[in-house]
Amino acid sequence: MALVKGVAQSQTRPLAFHGEQWTPRALFTVFGAFRASKDYAKLIEFLTNNFACYVKNKTFNFAGTGHLFHSLYAFVPNVSELVKERKQIRLQIDCVMRLFKNTTNDFKMYVELFAFIDAHGGAECPCLLLQQSKLNAVSFVENLNCKLFDIKPPKFKKEPFDSILSKYSLNYKALCFKKKEKCTVGCVTKRQKKMKRRQLLSDRVIYLHNKNDVLDERTLLHGPSGTSLAPCLHRYATVERQTRAGDEMVSFIRYCELCQMRA
């Protein structure tokens, strides 16, 4: 099979195409007919005979095919960068049947988007329209996050085909906001898990106020904590404290000037 300008060209093309090279639009018509007839065995035979170079061990690989087979599984770009484009499908009847069943609504959306392309032109594959709508939504959310208070908020740019996307519950703007909310919640959760590590072991001596005092070893507590304790040599003082504001009644408090312990 030869490649002409990035589009696959079969060596054994059906007569219906009269020698023309394969295009995403032509294959969309073929795949639509197979979906309608539910003849999955014929579809597998069609892919095997016409695109044998992409078949290996009963697996059809999409690597290097561009937009050619997007209508086979109705590719819809995802907001998350973690969800990648499909790379292959298993050429078995149950696998193809499951694929078609899971992408029924997406293929119906492709039908209307191809009709829009036929009427207005400008795109080779419906996924390019979906990608354009996705980029508009991402740009709108980013500009909204960076807007200043003295500037009017940006307006969301709607495309003529956005009504088709809304019909099939595909709203990239809402998905971008939902992704931003999940990211914010994840960041907050991660921030809450941060804990400051404190040094528990210490070689300090507590209540050692007079450096000239020599302490007996028997008065020191040597424990696994690594901290030594020495008794405080209390030096008491008495102060007057007013109990309430504006009240003449006072209390006499006796406390240690060294360790602040009350008598």
UniProtKB/Swiss-Prot annotation:
Which is a GO BP term held by this UniProt record?
A: regulation of DNA-templated transcription
Q: What keywords appear on the UniProt entry?
A: Transcription, Transcription regulation
The record's listing under Pfam families reads: Baculo_LEF5, Baculo_LEF5_C
Superkingdom: Viruses
Which InterPro entries does the entry mention? Baculo_LEF5_C (IPR021758), Baculo_LEF5_N (IPR006923)
Which protein family is it in? Belongs to the baculoviridae LEF-5 family.
Q: What does this protein do?
A: Required for late and very late gene expression.
Q: Protein name, please?
A: Late expression factor 5
